[in-house]
Amino acid sequence: MRTHFLLCFLFLFSYLGATEISVDPITFNDAYTNAGDGDVLLLEPGIYASSVTFPSGKTITLKSASATELPEIRFGVSGNDEAIMNGGLIFDGLKIVPSGDYFISVDKVGDIAAIRVLNCTIESVNRCFIRTNNNGYSIGEIEFANCIIRNCGDKGWNFLYPKHIV
């Protein structure tokens, strides 16, 4: 009975910890910076062009708030610090058009929990969608599900280039 109670309490506590936060292109950066582990940023339709750093110690979901009009991501995700550890990003229901050669480009980042791309349209990838460049660390999971990938440029090197162990 105690075990059952404890499990229920922990499940409820973890559920209450995650928050859904509505954002637009103007409020996105502050919400992303202040998001906690498990938080879901509900992106209103618009173009999001402010680059972000890969999260550390938390997994953040960027999800479309609209079922009919996809928010457009036109930024990159970067990281260059081995202190960035055990973070994750989930992209759900977005149109992703990378602004540079890479969409996710992390050089000296430690272990990554997960990168998930769900229900997204990915287009105009210039060189590589995910690039990691730090041997000896790992990515727990890379997942693409129900995505449309199109119009990738002729400069394309390869879609995924992880030096992390996957």
Report residues per predicted region.
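Extracellular beta-strand-rich solenoid/capping regions of secreted or surface-exposed proteins
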Residues: A49-T61, L70-A114, R127-G136
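Right-handed parallel beta-helix
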Residues: K63, G87-P98, A113-S124, I139-K155, ...
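Sec-dependent N-terminal signal peptides
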Residues: T3-S14
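Acidic Gly/Asp/Thr-rich repetitive segments characteristic of extracellular carbohydrate-active
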Residues: A18-A49, T53, T59
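Glycine-centered small-residue motifs that form tight turns
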Residues: I130, W157-N158
